[in-house]
Amino acid sequence: KTDRMLTLAEQWRLPLVFYAEGGGGRPGDTDRLGMTGLDGPSFVQFARLSGHVPVVGVVSGYCFAGNAAMLGCCDVIIATENASIGMGGPAMIEGGGLGVYHPAEVGPVSFQSPNGVVDILVKDEEEATTVAQKYLSYFQGPIADWKAPDQRLLRRAIPENRLRVYDIRSVIELIADEDSVLEIRRDFGVGMITAFIRIEGKPFGLIANNPKHLGGAIDAPAGDKAARFLQLCDAFDIPIVSLCDTPGFMVGPEAEKTAIVRHVARMFVTGASLTVPLFGIVLRKGYGLGAQSMLGGGFHA
């Protein structure tokens, strides 16, 4: 039944919403020849949807093993506060001699959100469904009914004193249409803001440096976060707005321990292959390679 639904989603290019609760495959079902021969088509079919149609994962409760593997293939994961996500449930963990844990202890959102697994954290399943609907709306083109905030407020959005920090999210709210901002991975890579917005009814992806974190410097999590979001926008032909305010990539021994070279370089690799327009706005500063990475690899139009 699942395989047929995935096949139809691919053939008809239908968005997929996956409610992922569950403990994985049941021994009586997964011990048949196909699975023991490592020929379970569901995972390949699910992963093949990536970049082909929007795929949203929703978790409200426990999600382990095979369910979690499919969840990880989703473009965006929405989880409730009581969710627990893990590649193995309590029985598997105990069977492997790794200890005894309650399901809620395996992968709570208290660390699955800051580590980037969960994209959007919500209160309950009802809110999760509402957010999923809002997310999918950005892939359906412009809307006619929109309202812009008072654009005169932008004149005072950035302090004249360059030593004063400001709230980049407030700036984003002024640029975007009212009630059109949907931030992705808010708790992960806090030095970079990634969000879907609308401007005059048209959908855009947005990346922005956060001056409240390292003065806007791009660290490893921020680079990884931006690159993945740029890929998502490019896959579905959503143009990008980049708000640049960075002194560059983070440097120093502590930064190098995080494999920053690999992570931030992904922004150049992704930027070089972008097929959608990228509109760059330098809010205060844009120095070095970090600034170039915010503009798809360079300032050349």
Could you say what each language-model-derived stretch is?
Residues 1-301:
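Ligand-binding clefts of soluble mixed alpha/beta catalytic domains
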